[in-house]
Regions:
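Membrane-embedded alpha-helical bundles of multi-pass enzymes
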Residues: 1-214, 407-408, 419-422, 434-436, ...
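Soluble catalytic domains of enzymes that build or remodel membrane lipids, polysaccharides, and related
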Residues: 212-476, 480
């Protein structure tokens, strides 16, 4: 009976911790919770068998992602033909897949405890966690949503280490603190004290580095840039009867832009209500607007190349269309169907599934105001792709997106929360234009200085600092993710042939 009650208590604590950790992300932003929310899982993994630890980790990870990704249910409810009892299925399946990686970390901690020691397992826990995040962000096209470090996007002093090690550097510090606290529960006091001491040094270094970077003067060169947020409801965006009303909203907003004297005007993803290059009259209107405002227009539109549709950003000046970038990283089950021959039937289930062709290369526009790159929609949540633009010479980055599919849920806010890390990783300003929000200006220190909120129609202009230096992350990329993968592989492989002690419990 006692074992049963212990199991119930463990389940309650683990699942409560997972639920609370999900609330660290927008909109609740309880950003302190990840500093301790993994303690129950890590501690339990050191006293349970690898199989049991995996199951507990998978269950807690699945709950974490189910809570975090609950906003996706809105999209399925409004824009799909999936019967309501089944519309939670896609979210739960995705959560269950992502939860596997949490289970893998718990399994590895238990395995290393059994083969070596709990002290070593907890010391390696930050590497195990980052390796799992790296794999989740790369395998099968990658899904890095919910990376633990993103929970700290408002704690600007903490996230400055992203310049050195990316968002995974912040995840590493968070898990190190959790592992040290778990050590206080399961280790002898000398071992626990050593772990706390090492983690204290790591945390102090993180905060000290952040303080130094935040005290530095901003880049000397800046340029005024305007964001337009038209706030067109998704059902109306492609409605032919609404096209003229949409354009009326656009050009009414543009009349407010001329007084701002910007160097660049940024519109959202697929802002053009028609296929732009097939609509010479619309191209001419934007060309004339660029001439009137005295600044280029960066405009999102669907385009057709050799009979295939693409998601494109066009640069329009008084000379017409002078540049383009075609989106490279397409959204699975949004812009294409993976394994189309097998899963193609899902196209009939949802309005939001398109069949687009991916672009082939990153493009850096020459400006004005300076060389800049564009990531479209969720391309910016992939650090490797974002880095390509900066390495190719971009000193300013633009994100154009259309998060209207997610309504007034937490989805658009969670999407925004990832971009402060891209800014810090490369010390580059980010100009983010979203159809229905959240549009924002983000400084090279990751501070969101101005924003237009969800479904707020308007324009805003800000003097945007231009990148002045290359960072370690720009030069080396996600070295910590690769190092963590190597450490994890070596640790598990190195213990594979050792005999597992019988002392580790099986339940």
């Amino acid at each position: 009976m006692r074992r049963l009650w212990d199991g119930v208590l463990h389940a309650v604590v683990l699942l409560l911790a997972a639920w609370v950790m999900a609330l660290a992300f927008p909109r609740t932003d309880w950003s302190l919770t990840p500093w301790a929310a993994l303690v129950p899982l890590l501690a339990l993994a050191t006293i349970r068998s690898p199989r049991t630890a995996f199951l507990w980790g998978w269950a807690s990870g699945t709950l974490f992602f189910a809570v975090l990704l609950r906003w996706l249910q809105f999209t399925f409810q409004v824009y799909s033909a999936i019967p309501w009892p089944l519309m939670y299925g896609p979210v739960l399946l995705l959560a269950a897949y992502c939860g596997v990686w949490t289970g893998a970390v718990a399994w590895a901690v238990s395995w290393l405890t059994a083969r070596r020691s709990a002290a070593l397992a907890l010391a390696l826990a930050p590497f195990l966690w980052v390796a799992a995040e790296w794999l989740r962000g790369h395998l099968f096209g990658g899904f890095p949503w919910g990376t633990l470090g993103y929970s700290q996007y408002l704690r600007v002093r903490v996230i400055q280490i992203a310049e050195l090690a990316g968002v995974h550097g912040v995840s590493f510090v968070l898990v190190a603190v959790n592992a040290a606290l778990a050590g206080c529960v399961v280790l002898r006091w000398r071992q626990a004290l050593a772990g706390v001491g090492a983690t204290a040094v790591l945390l102090a270094g993180t905060l000290a580095f952040g303080s130094v970077r935040l005290a530095e003067a901003p880049p000397a060169t800046a340029a005024p840039i305007t964001i337009v947020q038209p706030s067109i409801e998704q059902p109306l965006k492609w409605e032919p009867r609404h096209t003229q009303e949409t354009l009326g909203i656009y050009f009414a907003l543009l009349r407010r832009v001329a007084d701002e004297h910007p160097a660049l005007v940024v519109w959202p993803e697929t802002a053009a209500p028609t296929i732009l290059r097939n609509d010479p009259a619309l191209v001419e209107r934007f060309r004339a607007a660029a001439a009137n405002v005295g600044a280029p227009m960066l405009l999102g539109s669907i385009d057709v190349v050799n009979g295939r549709f693409r998601n494109t950003a066009f640069l329009i000046t008084e000379a017409g269309i002078v540049g383009r970038y075609d989106k490279i990283q397409l959204v699975p089950f949004g812009e294409f169907v993976p394994l189309s021959r097998v899963l193609g039937f899902v196209r009939s289930w949802a309005q939001f599934i398109a069949e687009l062709e991916a672009g082939s290369r990153a493009v850096v526009f020459n400006g004005p105001p300076a060389p800049f790159g564009v990531v479209i929609c969720y391309e910016g949540i992939f650090p490797d792709l974002f880095r390509e633009f900066v390495r190719d010479g971009a000193v300013l980055m633009v994100n154009m997106t259309n998060d209207a599919w997610f309504g007034r849920t937490s989805g658009p806010e969670q999407h925004l929360a990832m971009y402060p890390f891209r800014a810090v990783e490369h010390r580059v300003s980010i100009v983010r234009a979203a159809n229905t929000g959240v549009s924002a200006f983000i400084t090279p220190t990751g501070v969101i200085v101005r924003r237009l909120h969800l479904f707020e129609r308007g324009v805003m202009t800000e003097s945007v600092p231009l990148r002045a230096r290359r960072t370690l992350f720009t030069r080396l990329g996600d070295w910590l993710g690769l190092l963590s993968l190597a450490v994890t592989t070596a640790a598990v492989a190195g213990t594979w042939r050792r005999v597992e002690p019988a002392a580790v419990g099986s339940v």
